[in-house]
A protein has these predicted regions:
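Short intrinsically disordered, low-complexity coil segments enriched in acidic
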Residues: 1-5, 78, 89
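Acyl-donor binding region in acyl/amide transferases
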Residues: 16-78, 83-84
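C-terminal "cap" of GNAT-fold acetyltransferases
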Residues: 87-96
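Conserved beta-strand in the GNAT
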Residues: 1-16, 32
Length: 96
């Protein structure tokens, strides 16, 4: 009941153009979450919690729209804002 789109990069993107430019299948530095969509409450969090331990990256970062909803979602789910860019926000999730 949830969908997430990811890309693997060695640089944190701040735009969708940079995401396309930096994406490499064999990158290990960052997993970038750029779409999280759920069909019910709690499923976005569930899919992120399920995927994080499986992705084998050093860091887990979002490329998020500049919306209050994105800020609320990521902060509520334990992420820290690490980038306030012209077109996007970046949040980082840390495995505990």
């Amino acid at each position: 009941k949830a969908v997430v789109c990811i890309a693997k990069t060695d640089i944190i993107p701040t735009t969708m153009q940079e995401l396309a430019q930096y994406s490499k299948q064999n990158a290990t530095e960052f997993t970038i979450f750029y779409t999280v969509w759920s069909y019910g409450g709690g499923y976005g969090r569930l899919i992120l919690n399920y995927l994080l331990p499986l992705l084998n990256s050093k860091r887990y970062v979002t490329l998020s729209p500049k919306t209050d909803m994105a800020v609320r979602f990521h902060i509520k789910n334990g992420a820290k804002m690490i980038g306030d860019n012209e077109e996007s926000y970046n949040f980082e999730y840390v495995l505990s």
